[in-house]
């Protein structure tokens, strides 16, 4: 397990179809356990993702983090997700969000609106 820091974020990216993909994400390690959440909606396809658990939180760079977990897709359980986020400046300047699902769906890029925020460990 990594860190003690945590990440939160929300906003939107352009999806592969050119539509808006809205998301809310958080992840970290608290009291020795992974925690977090994910919600994502692709407004082009109608795809809806709701995270149901976090199985990994990893430091991948000075301002980037990797989160993995389980999810429901369009209300159906049994999927997994991978999220990569980067907090590249304030407020949300050049921040990135990327999502991959076990069903093959992928979307990601620089935020068109919103912010990824990396937080220091709570004391």
Task: Identify the residue ranges that each predicted region occupies.
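Boundary/junction segments of secreted and surface-exposed precursor proteins
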Residues: 1-16
């Amino acid at each position: 397990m990594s860190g003690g820091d945590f990440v939160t974020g929300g906003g939107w990216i352009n999806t592969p179809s050119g539509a808006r993909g809205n998301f809310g994400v958080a992840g970290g390690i608290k009291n020795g356990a992974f925690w977090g959440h994910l919600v994502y909606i692709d407004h082009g396809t109608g795809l809806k993702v709701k995270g149901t658990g976090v199985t990994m939180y990893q430091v991948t760079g000075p301002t980037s983090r990797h989160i993995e977990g389980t999810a429901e897709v369009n209300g159906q359980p049994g999927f997994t997700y991978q999220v990569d986020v980067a907090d590249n400046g304030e407020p949300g300047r050049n921040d990135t969000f990327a999502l991959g699902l076990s069903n093959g769906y992928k979307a990601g890029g620089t935020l068109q609106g919103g912010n990824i925020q990396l937080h220091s460990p709570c004391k």
